[in-house]
Amino acid sequence: MLRKSAYLALLLLSFLGLAVPVANAAPKDYSAIARNIIPSGQKGTPPLDTTQAVMYDALTPLFNNVTDSDIKEYFKSEKLGTSTDGPYTTETVPKAGVTIQRDKYGVPHVTATTYDGGIWAAGWIAAEDRGLLLQQARYNARVAAIDAPGLSAIGLVAGLQNFQPSQRTEDEIAKQTDALKAAGSEGKAVLKDIDTYLTGINDYLDANSPATPDWTRNDVYAVNALKDQFLGEGGGDEARRSQFLGGLIKRLGAKKGWKVFNDLRQHTNNESPTSIDGRFAYSPIPSNKSGSVIIDPKSFKPVDVTPNTPEELSDRSSSNPLEPRHQASNTLMITKGRSATGRPLMVGGPQIGYFAPGLTYEIDMNAPGLKWRGATSAPFPGYLLIGRGQDFATTLTSASGDVIDQFAETLCGGSDTKYLYKGKCRTMGTFDAGTLNGDPVSFRTTVHGPVVGYATVKGKKVAISSKRSSYGKDVLDLMFNRRLSNGSVKGPQSFFEAASKTPQTFNSFYIDNKNVALYTSGKLPIRDKRVDPGLLTKGTGQYEWKGFLSKKGHPHGMNPKSGMMVNWNNSVARGFGAADDEWGRNGSVQRVGLLTRMLNRNKSKNGKLNMADVVSAMNAGATQDVRAIFTVPLLA
């Protein structure tokens, strides 16, 4: 029942034509079918907090028998403009040229005479519809931006905790302004949009909550980092995997221990289901592993920067070395050749955690240079996250690309706080991050990043540090979303170019009237050829990253030969190595098989699928257990 356990924005799209931009007239809508549902509701407060959830819940009992009339009944319209779902109420806003109308679901339909007016309206709506979430997230999210060891930003937000940042933390996060400026004119344009968006938030706060401190750039940077930590990262579990391997070798011997380890991690697997055609080799396992470290079994001890923090609010390493990240996003796309309508179809089910109020909310945006509708969130200054433009739609699933590596630091000078790097004994830094519920938060750092724990190698103590490729660059993700929102995306190739801008790791999907496409993003490091990507890297300086995967090297593709592009957080392409924390992602039995199985079952005699067929496949697959369908029969 994964689909029900988390927030789901379901997008149903089929396109008939190409859009020609016109000044700021009512937006031309080229969709044949465009419907969505956001179960957590628009405002997260009564009476509209459960309206959509009740609608969507009624879909589940239908299993594989969803009809066109069911789609109309249980999903609301995602058409552009105010043509459906009335009656509408008009808000009073202190901004000339901006109109906000709410439909019966509370969804705001924005009409603005200027681009900046649309961005301002998005800020006003964020403060109005997610005020509690904004206040709870703005400071707690900072632990994600600084990679505070053992702390989960989303856990602190959901647990209503109180992190108060130090000036050191504020200064560190503020450096993301430099990252935007270094990105050239596009980065500077994002920065301008952030400032306009902040004006909208703060105008609402001034009018309705004057005691609340104004929102700042750092707040936007921090909530972007929260999104990155929660959904846009992968890897960083090498210490636990390494000590697990150490245990296997101790128990089974080197040859058998390595064999079991490699069988379990399934770094690559030519029998695993994939989403696109072609091969994209990344992060191979070398035969020479001289740059890797295997620590002693059960020797890894994570640092605890906040010993008084409850376990459920932290991100401390589990005692289970095989525990995966919990992800549940799926996407089903059908090419025009396989579609009964002759146009591509998409059903997207991105899962972003079920909270009240939800992390995302909906906007229908109509301003010069901004014509979109769909899910957005506090990190996005007037930009689309998941949804549609006039003639395309987009959704995503977490890719969990390997953007985090752990390093084994050789200690020196008889100290736990001195380490060897490029032949010199260095002293670790100290990062005083602030306080959590009044208790100080402080951690050590090396040239690679925060010290996350200690372990032993053949009885000798080492420090374990963590390096994230997107550190200090979380906000660059917004360049992708800006392009989705401002008309820059005009086809698969421009979509690939846009998606390549984000350092966060996602599978991003695209559909228009002719094509379906996918691009897997992330600032993916190229490792030294002597480093096993699933193990700790020696931190002495000889085995550092050699650069990052090129845009062309990222998995991407369009219109697969099978006629179906399906993903449920599985590997997208052959040869693409799974991150060290993603054991089983490349397994031959995957839950995505439930979706393809139902799609194949629902095909008509001529091999075609309509929208009801695709929704039925999604609904049925989400209510089945992959083990019962594929594995248990083999044991009978």
Language-model regions, residue ranges each:
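Hydrophobic alpha-helical segments
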Residues: 382, 504-602
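Substrate-recognition/specificity elements adjacent to catalytic centers across diverse enzyme folds
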Residues: 26-345, 350-353, 368-370
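Bacterial N-terminal signal peptides that target proteins for export
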Residues: 1-9
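Ordered core of a single globular domain
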Residues: 236-311, 472-503, 509, 565, ...
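Sec/Tat signal peptide C-region and signal peptidase I cleavage site
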Residues: 20-25
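Glycine- and hydrophobic-rich flexible loops that cap the catalytic core of alpha/beta enzyme folds
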Residues: 367-381, 387-392, 396-539
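Second-shell loop/turn segments in exported
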Residues: 118-123, 172-192, 465-468, 479-486, ...
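Bacterial N-terminal signal peptides
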Residues: 9-17
